[in-house]
Regions:
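Long, charge-dense
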Residues: 84-141
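Hydrophobic/aromatic ligand-binding patch that stacks against planar heteroaromatic rings
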Residues: 62, 85-86, 178-179
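N-terminal, positively charged regions that mediate nucleic acid binding
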Residues: 1-69, 75, 79
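Short, ordered loop/turn segments at secondary-structure junctions
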Residues: 17, 48, 76-79, 92, ...
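Residue-level signature of catalytic and energy-coupling elements of molecular machines
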Residues: 16, 73, 165, 217
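Intrinsically disordered, compositionally biased charged tails
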Residues: 1-6, 230-286
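Extended, charged alpha-helical interaction scaffolds
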Residues: 129-167, 171-188, 192
Length: 286
């Protein structure tokens, strides 16, 4: 049976994870993780990075296999498509468009918005239900659906608050970090040389900007989740040989059957406009 693989220094170097920011932008709390400077750019000590990645891989594995947890990936920058793809591939959840204040601290409102998204999709997919609407009204509903999908599509099936957060840039997505700390949700995060490692539970010192770096982090995290799912299936007597190894979705479906994941409660009679305003207000209050 497969085991968690350790990342090599060579892999980290190839992904450019050792490159930090300009020395003038550094956070002194990152000093223990900095190897030195090159052309006024801090170089990260990859021994610490490799060690912490091993720790984090075990944390992710345990969160899925032993706790049946929900992991939320967060990155609202240009890497969003990479992060979303890896999160989907391992059956987890993501916020990659924009973090709306209250996504963790105002979960009731988030649940209502997700319910509204479900209702709109069902209505727009049924010709009989939209037959009495004008083209302008239908276009308005489509736009609302698209906006809700961008904001909540990655968490619509999460069924509750996440039990673990993975953040790629704690400076950009500082509101997500602040909310997770308030809700006592453990945080795994990439901490570049301009970041504060004390803000998260499991800091991984490394480049948080390069696409190659983000792709490697996501692959490592996704592999840990998929390995946990593989072991869950094996422990439940599922014939892994009968499941297509090239199709993670098939294993995810089988895993959900044995863990009996419960969907979130649906809330009716909502005003999504008011709910969006609540999230915006929470965003300002943080």
């Amino acid at each position: 049976m497969s085991t968690i693989s350790s990342v090599t220094i060579s892999e980290l170097l190839d992904a450019g994870i050792h490159y930090g920011h300009k020395a003038s932008r550094w956070n002194p709390k990152m000093a223990p993780y900095i190897y030195g400077k090159r052309d006024d750019v801090h170089i990260i000590n990859l021994d610490y990075t490799a060690s912490q990645i091993d720790v984090v891989s075990k944390v992710i594995y345990k969160e899925i296999k032993e706790k049946n947890g929900r992991i939320l990936f967060v990155d609202t920058r240009r890497h969003r498509d990479i992060v979303a793809q890896y999160a989907e591939n391992c059956g987890q959840y993501y916020v990659t468009h924009r973090w709306l204040g209250g996504m963790l601290t105002n979960w009731v409102t988030v649940s209502k918005a997700i319910n509204k998204l479900d209702q709109l999709e069902k209505k727009l997919a049924d010709p009989e239900k939209i037959a009495g609407y004008t083209k302008r009204e239908i276009l308005s509903m489509q736009r609302m659906r698209d906006n809700l999908q961008r904001s909540f599509g990655g968490i619509r099936n999460m069924g509750g608050k996440p039990t673990l957060l993975i953040v790629m840039d704690i400076n950009k997505d500082h509101i997500a970090v602040k909310e997770a700390r308030r809700e006592k949700i453990p945080i795994i995060a990439i901490v570049d040389t301009n970041s504060d490692p004390d803000l998260v539970d499991y800091p991984i010192p490394g480049n948080d900007d390069a696409i190659r770096s983000i792709r490697l982090y996501c692959k490592i995290f996704s592999d840990a989740v998929l390995l946990a799912i593989e072991h869950m299936l094996a422990a439940s007597g599922v014939d892994l040989g009968a499941i297509n190894d090239d199709s993670p979705s098939e294993r995810l479906k089988a895993a959900k059957k044995i863990t009996k994941m419960k969907p979130s409660k649906k809330v009716t009679k909502i005003n999504v406009g008011q709910d969006q305003n609540k999230l915006e207000k929470d965003n300002k209050d943080l």
